Amino acid sequence: LEDEGQKGEAFRHGMRITGTVSSGLGRAHIFMAQKHYQDQFQSLLGTSVWPGTLNLNVSDDDLRSYIALRLKSGIDTLDASSELIEQASSIDVSSLDAHRVRGFLRDGVSFGGATAFIAEFAFGESSVECAVLIPDLTRHYDVVEIISAKFLREHFSLVDGDNVTIELS
């Protein structure tokens, strides 16, 4: 990837966010394996996706950029400071397409919706297509969830603490 902008800031082709790989709760597979979601991911990325997410912790400029995506998605970021939300609202994300992932009911259980942004995941000299997935209901405003056809941890031999970059366009 060419360095066309500051990390965490919008640049002429979109936005770049750098984060630190972290372990999640291990529950994403329950949702990600659902056929209703997989069908939508197939339409979005042209392939089924790995039934799980890769979590990235973000801070500083990268957190502001991620909150700007959350704001575009209509997701409240109640735990963030009003100053941080104000700074995020000044970031221009109008060139980034938000793709709606519809929720559904199955056997009386509600599976919530989400918003996805197409991106490229980069680590070292390699990259793969992915999407930033922002669930309508989430506990963490500073954790970016990434979906991909690849099991990213295995594909890139990632461990907690590795720094990776996603580029949205």
Residues covered by each model-derived region:
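Generic low-complexity, intrinsically disordered segments
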Residues: 1-9
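Long, compositionally biased stretches
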Residues: 8-143, 160, 164-166
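Short alpha-helix capping/helix-loop boundary micro-motifs
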Residues: 148-155
